[in-house]
A protein has these predicted regions:
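Cap/insert and terminal regions of metallo-dependent hydrolase folds
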Residues: 43-133
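Core dinuclear metal-dependent hydrolase active-site scaffold
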Residues: 1-50, 132-139
């Protein structure tokens, strides 16, 4: 792990216009042309999309993937995103990397593979579906 000294971070909150309860995410400028956005616990809506266009990274909930998501429809039931929803949004908004989290625990052994493969059907960038406590560098 590299330690960067003398870095200035600009972090600001964004109203996520959440449906269930008032929520705020954040955008962090971590270099002159790179941003990391945390999108909270609900589906990202059109009012929020303008803030994340061209971000280097987004961290988003993705409750389910594939056929399971199509059948259960977590967007309608709980206002949680699906892998497909996040991947299509990221592709449309020119986001370079997505981190998918806040998912079901139905198949933890294969979840990472399932989520990444599903996202790659709709998105050309990098996809991360970390296990709890897994770490990786954000560059």
């Amino acid at each position: 792990m590299n330690i960067i000294e003398n870095i200035i971070l600009n972090i600001y909150s964004i109203d996520l216009n959440a449906f269930k309860v008032k929520q705020f995410g954040f955008i962090m400028n971590y270099s002159p042309n790179k941003q990391f956005a945390f999108l909270g616990d609900e589906v990202c809506n059109e009012k929020t999309e303008k803030y994340i266009k061209d971000c280097e990274w987004i961290f988003s909930d993705a409750y389910m993937a594939g056929k399971e998501a199509e059948e259960y429809n977590p967007i309608e039931r709980h206002h949680h995103s699906t892998v497909k929803f996040v991947a299509e949004m990221a592709e449309r908004l020119n986001i370079k990397n997505i981190i998918l989290s806040h998912s079901t625990d139905n198949d933890l052994e294969h979840r990472k593979q399932i989520f990444i493969e599903d996202a790659k059907k709709y998105y050309k960038g990098n996809v991360f579906a970390p296990y709890d406590l897994e770490t990786f560098e954000i560059v």
